[in-house]
Amino acid sequence: MNKLELIKSSIKSIPNHPKEGIIFRDITSLTEVPEAFQATIDLIIERYKSKGITKVIGTESRGFIFGAPVALALNVPFILVRKPGKLPRETIAQSYQLEYGQDTLEMHVSSIQAGDNVLVIDDLLATGGTIEATVKLVERLQGQVKHAAFVISLPDLGGEVRLRELGVEPFTLVEFSGH
């Protein structure tokens, strides 16, 4: 079994969670298989080790799981993007639309400097709303996001197209159809 097959086979699918008609892709089952978890990190590192990345952002909360080890391997700072009220220093906020409402993300204003080449990492790419909000935060602080990495993509939900329209090249390890 190659690395991508190992990763995909390690992700459990949970039907009707969190609501009827949704199939939840559970990456916590992947982190319980050390070989699959290591393969995930290794493939992301390999992809970005020569891209001149100066910061890695992990989005709340499963982006932290994959972003932190990648940042360490690339020897660059790891930045957290969180829900409101979770970060202790001065923050900048960006709201974004959800299917039924709105949410907000924050990051420390001191985390990004002008010219930073930022890699954003999250576990799953669906509609791309979280990453679009993160890109806007970085751009407001004069950094740039040209790359975003995900363990899973749900291409039927349009996130890859949305990110490309923002000038961000998505990289995903495995895809699942549907929701």
From Swiss-Prot:
Gene Ontology cellular component annotations, sorted alphabetically: cytosol
Q: What are the alphabetically sorted keywords of the record?
A: Cytoplasm, Glycosyltransferase, Purine salvage, Transferase
Oxidoreductase listed as a keyword: no
Q: Which GO terms describe its molecular function?
A: adenine phosphoribosyltransferase activity
CDD domains for the chain: PRTases_typeI
Q: Where do transmembrane segments lie in this chain?
A: none
GO biological process: one example: AMP salvage
Location in the cell:
Cytoplasm
Q: What class of enzyme is it?
A: transferase
**Pathway terms, separated by semicolons:** Purine metabolism; AMP biosynthesis via salvage pathway; AMP from adenine: step 1/1
Note the superkingdom of the native organism: Bacteria
Q: What does the record give as EC number?
A: 2.4.2.7
Instruction: Supply the InterPro entries for this chain.
Output: Ade_phspho_trans (IPR005764), Adenine_PRTase (IPR050120), PRibTrfase_dom (IPR000836), PRTase-like (IPR029057)
Q: What is its main location?
A: cytoplasm
**Reactions that this protein is recorded to catalyse:** AMP + diphosphate = 5-phospho-alpha-D-ribose 1-diphosphate + adenine
Q: Name one Pfam family in it.
A: Pribosyltran
What the entry lists under Gene3D superfamilies is as follows: 3.40.50.2020
Q: Which NCBIfam families match?
A: apt (TIGR01090), PRK02304.1-1 (NF002632), PRK02304.1-3 (NF002634), PRK02304.1-5 (NF002636)
Per the record, the similarity remark reads:
Belongs to the purine/pyrimidine phosphoribosyltransferase family.
Q: What does this protein do?
A: Catalyzes a salvage reaction resulting in the formation of AMP, that is energically less costly than de novo synthesis.
PANTHER family documented for this protein? ADENINE PHOSPHORIBOSYLTRANSFERASE, PHOSPHORIBOSYLTRANSFERASE DOMAIN-CONTAINING PROTEIN
Assembly and interactions?
Homodimer.
This protein's name: Adenine phosphoribosyltransferase
The source organism is Histophilus somni (strain 2336) (Haemophilus somnus)
Name of the coding gene: apt
